[in-house]
Structures are given as C-alpha cells and as structure tokens.
Amino acid sequence: ETDVHLLNLIVNWLRMLPPQAPCPPPPNILQKELSEGIAEEKAKGNAAYRKKDYETAIKHYTLGIALITSRPMWESSSIIADELTVMLANRSAAMLACEAHIEALCDADAAVKIKGAWGKGHFRKGKALAALQRYEEARAAFELGHQCEPDNEDFLQAIAALP
C-alpha cells in the first residue's frame, strides 16, 4: 500500500509539470560551450605550467574543475570522470611545484579514486607522497602506476630515487 501511495505522489507531481517541460538529452550530448570553456582553461593552465607560472596554472586548473563539476547530471559520467582526473592530475603537478605537497596529494588521490588504474594519477600521488617523506607509500603508488604502465621507465626511476 505504501508503494502505491508513493507512486501516486510521483505521478501527480509529474502531471503538474508543464507539457513543454524539456526532457534531458541523451548522455552522449555535451554542452559545446562548456566543453570549450573546459578545454580553454586546461590549455591556459598548461601554458602557464610550461612557463613555470604555477600559481596561474593552479588558477586555470581550478576554474576548469569548477566548469567540469557544473556539467548537468545527465551528461556522461565517464566523460566527466576523464576530464576531472586529467585536470586534478595537472593541478597536482602545479601544486607540487609550489611545494603545496598536501594539496598535491589530495588532488592526486582524488584522481586515482575517480579513475582507478591510471598510471599518471599514481605517479602524481607517488611524487606528492615522496615530497612529504612518506617513502613507503610513495613506493607503493609508483609500483601501482608501473603495473598500469609497465613500459613507462619513469616509475622505475622514481622508485630508484627514493631513499
């Protein structure tokens, strides 16, 4: 009886919506302007990072993250996850360059939690952990990254550089 009551409430609520209420588009449709804004912030962040202007890079990556997280809920979660992990990993690198090691670790850890088996995320996490002198955890992060990308020698070099 309770289930029917709840169902009736939902049906009555839906009936109150105007007939022209828009349906969300399919999840493979992305808002072009938003995608362009995200790409622009990433490009500006990357350009600033290459110039070693890390504070500006952080600002642009942060703006990009804000745009990504403002995407409508009906857009594809896999696209959002891909965009977000790259932007978090990039901001982690910029934070690390500014010696904001805890913030760098937070971003790298979030990227790894979102994407899982992703070498770049594990590499950034390992670098941040090493900067915090948490060497065993750094070694574990580098080893996980190396499992994701067995041909990438950077992981072995990073492990060898640990005390």
What are these regions (language model features)?
Residues E1-P163:
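Alpha-helical tetratricopeptide repeat
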